[in-house]
Amino acid sequence: MMKGSLRRCLNWMTLCVMASGWSCPAQSPDAWPEEDPIRDHVPVLGVFPPEGAGIHFHGDLMVIDPMNRRGGLRKGDGTTQPPRHYFAMLPYGMVHYHGAPADLRDIPIGTHMHGRFLLPLQGEEETIPKPAEDQLKRHPQGAYNHAILLEDDVSFYQRHGRSWKILGTEQGGGPAPRLKLSVEPVGPAVEGGINKAALFDIDEATRIWKNRQLVGMDEIQAGLEVQVNLTWGPFESLATTDIWLDPESLEAFREIQRQRHLRLIRSRFLPGWVNEVTNHDTGGGEMSLTLFGGMDPLLYKEIKQAENPKISDAHVTLRTWRYHQEFAVPSQRTHWQENEDPPLGSSGIELKVTLPQMLDGFRPGQVVRLKGHWTYVLLPFDEWLMEPEDFEQASRMRLP
């Protein structure tokens, strides 16, 4: 009896995978190219990766370390070994939520995310514990554990010009029947996305938005083009957390997240890294910088208006030392250049500054943060790097 039930469950799970329409790289090691110099690019400080570096991976965000910008994704189909894909954000790694720039701390646990993952940053190979060799043979994607981009479903699909056309709702079958939202994709095929008709779980926990308000399921009509966010569902399904029936409702969410982002960066400062340094014999020096990408355009405009930005050195996690404003060095900007079509991770903005004092962290390839004309606030003390123990604690991700 148990064998029969198990067989029926496995058959149903197989049908769910086929119905989901995921476009994913093959998991078989035989199908994994042994050598691919672009995919297997090893990132180094001071150089942005080439286009196409790394792999696409998706899963539910189940673990976050917001201070050090690390986390773990879970594949709902149970195929990943180890069961979570742990990762660290690259210094220039970008997060998007509801179509706006974000930080890991903004993402609710359980949110289904898409990411672009590279091999570890040179010098940071031990930051994320490496899977066992037998696990890597079966699941080679586990080696790619430094993220350059992480985004929820609505950000991912909307960025690629995709939406979902509602076909209707239907009662699902299987051992645990659930109501299903039947949809088909509208727009181009997307690497790592769902590229054919799909069924998503929908129930009373799903938030349905119209005219910037919560509405009932009776507002769901066949033919509507919508955006959705997803999470884990039983038997390898995906469940809807939010459905936006009109652009106005999604825009309201995007603006709220944008304001969160502005508040965060104005208090933590804009990140970038040092390109070149010239030390003066009598103290001080000159420095050229590149600002990281993925920030709201208003922040770049505000930093451009600040001809004397204060600059603090920072860790690869973007954390700063103690009172980051008090220890930041005032500068005089001498050059500002905006380059078109920058590589992923870069804003394309380069600037040169002169400084009366050169901190130890002002070295080529090292991370810095720039303060504009923003009100200074004292950060929570657990975000500071103060003692050697703090560096040791931040050097590796502690797995749950």
Residue spans for each PLM region:
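Serine residues within intrinsically disordered or low-complexity segments
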Residues: 5, 20-23
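Initiator methionine at the very start of the polypeptide chain
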Residues: 1-2, 26
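Bacterial N-terminal signal peptides that target proteins for export
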Residues: 2-13
